[in-house]
Design a protein with these regions (language model features):
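Positively charged, polar, low-complexity stretches
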Residues: 1-111
């Protein structure tokens, strides 16, 4: 199966230096330009990723590609939180046709 992601609107969720859920939510809110009412919890993140009305404008028609970088340290220090985050990202992709999420490998990429 092949999918062309070339035209997707891409944003980078850089988790370098993020050590907790609060930091992850703040980064996500910033890079996705989420509204002030974004609840900064797992359910709100899932809802926002699945709701194209809160996506950056170019992504609504073209689709959204979220590239997650620098996630290794967060995953190592917070394995439970990382498991939840990765489950949320996976579920959002499963629910939303125009959404793709990629984990950038590099450094200590141990999945």
């Amino acid at each position: 199966m092949s999918e062309d992601l070339a035209d997707r609107y891409a944003v980078t969720l850089d988790l370098t230096g993020v050590t907790d859920k609060t930091g992850l939510m703040e980064r996500a809110a910033h890079v996705l330009d989420l509204p002030e009412w974004f609840g900064r919890n797992w359910d709100a993140l899932l809802d926002s990723l699945c709701d194209t009305t809160v996506w950056p404008t170019p992504a609504v028609e073209r689709g959204l590609l979220v590239v997650v970088r620098g996630w290794h340290t967060f995953a190592e220090k917070n394995p439970r939180e990382w498991r939840i985050a990765s489950d949320i990202l996976s579920e959002a992709v499963d629910r939303t046709f125009l959404l793709d999420v990629m984990l950038a490998l590099g450094g200590n990429a141990h999945l």
